């Protein structure tokens, strides 16, 4: 439960004070927010307790034990036992808001997921399902937290645009076109040679997102699907959580062409904090490496087109993360050796360390206005342009 020490940026006392003021006063949004509770903020003894309970519930089945433990953490976060932990971790992070994810692997799962997510909103009076920028700004002003409903999966739509309308009416405001596998819309980044572009249905899907006011997200999309999304969308396109190929070459990172195409739509590239995608050595990746990706996007396309989408850490135990990486990740499109595990970015081990992002941006010499844009204002500009009033 201990928060890691502040990362050493060698800031002066004046810079530390400036970073603290910026962190407290800015709207900070994480558009792939897996928190607020992560692996290293679980209560003392939780690892052992959850392992014993998972083994009892799912004897002899490591994958089932992993899934059970992760689901149990989520149950506890909307129950009594972790409710205070959930609130404390979110408020200690300084984040104004972040995504709350729907699972759209099929229609039934989408509806089940919506019920589960609604329970999260209903449990916490300080957590607001936000569908407008005005609501997000009000959350900041009133000391509340903003939940933005998003989905990474799109295979569950099949060719059912009515399901997209249904989920929009529920509150969905950001939709990724593909995860780690090809679907009827387009291709993921793990397909060879950049995968296929948008299908005819995929073009209609993008047009429907534009019509409804749903942000088109290309975070996991392959090269050609990303480029097509930018070509056919009449509204800003984002990559909610990705990295820069020129900083760390990996399939999950975007090329200069993709970053430029997203920026040309008026969109934003969100930088993730996943150690095995961010730096060459996952064991020794730091918040400085994370900020290197931000710096590159700023140099390439300007300060208005970069944001944050950490995607890490996950709300799971260390042993479940190891099991997930070994057995589950390969089944959902991750390359061998990739996927959630026990590594962390030094300086971002926990969401409660999020001030290190602001401190790092101060250390790199960004102005107050630029830092506020990176932390959240760029996302808000896109939402203002896309979301219907």
Roles of regions detected by a PLM:
Residues 155-158, 166-253:
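Divalent metal-binding pocket/active-site signature
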Residues 1-193, 249-389:
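N-terminal hydrophobic targeting/anchoring segments and the immediately downstream early-domain regions
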């Amino acid at each position: 439960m201990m928060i890691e020490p502040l990362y050493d940026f060698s800031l002066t006392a004046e810079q530390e004070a400036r970073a603290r003021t910026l962190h407290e006063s800015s709207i900070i949004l994480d558009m792939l927010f897996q928190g607020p509770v992560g692996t290293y903020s679980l209560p003392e003894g939780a690892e052992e307790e959850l392992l014993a309970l998972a083994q009892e519930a799912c004897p002899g089945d490591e994958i089932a034990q992993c899934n059970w433990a992760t689901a149990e953490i989520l149950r506890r976060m909307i129950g009594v036992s972790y409710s205070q932990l959930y609130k404390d971790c979110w408020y200690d992070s300084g984040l104004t808001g972040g995504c709350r994810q729907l699972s759209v692997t099929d229609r039934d799962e989408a509806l089940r997921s919506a019920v589960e997510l609604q329970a999260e909103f209903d449990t916490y009076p300080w957590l607001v399902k936000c569908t407008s920028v005005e609501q997000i700004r009000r959350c900041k002003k009133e000391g509340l937290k903003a939940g933005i409903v998003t989905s990474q999966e799109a295979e569950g739509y099949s060719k059912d645009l009515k399901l997209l309308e249904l989920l929009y009416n529920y509150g969905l405001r950001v939709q990724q076109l593909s995860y780690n596998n090809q679907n009827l819309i387009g291709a993921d980044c793990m397909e060879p040679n950049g995968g296929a572009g948008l299908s005819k249905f995929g073009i209609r899907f993008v047009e429907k997102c534009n019509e409804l006011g749903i942000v088109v997200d290309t975070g996991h999309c392959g090269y050609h699907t990303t480029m097509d999304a930018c070509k056919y969308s009449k509204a800003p396109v984002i990559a909610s959580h990705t990295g820069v190929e020129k900083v760390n070459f990996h399939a999950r990172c975007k090329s200069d062409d993709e970053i430029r195409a997203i920026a040309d739509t008026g969109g934003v590239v969100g930088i993730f904090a996943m150690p095995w995608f961010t730096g060459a050595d996952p064991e020794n990746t730091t918040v400085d490496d994370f900020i290197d990706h931000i710096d590159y996007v700023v140099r390439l396309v300007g300060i208005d087109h970069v944001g944050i989408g950490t995607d890490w850490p996950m709300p799971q135990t260390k042993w479940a993360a190891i099991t997930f990486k070994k057995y589950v990740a390969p089944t959902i499109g991750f390359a061998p050796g990739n996927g959630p595990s026990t590594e962390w970015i030094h300086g971002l081990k926990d969401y409660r360390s999020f001030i290190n992002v602001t401190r790092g941006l101060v250390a790199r010499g960004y102005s107050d206005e630029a830092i506020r844009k990176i932390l959240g204002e760029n996302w808000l500009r896109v939402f203002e342009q896309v979301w219907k009033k």
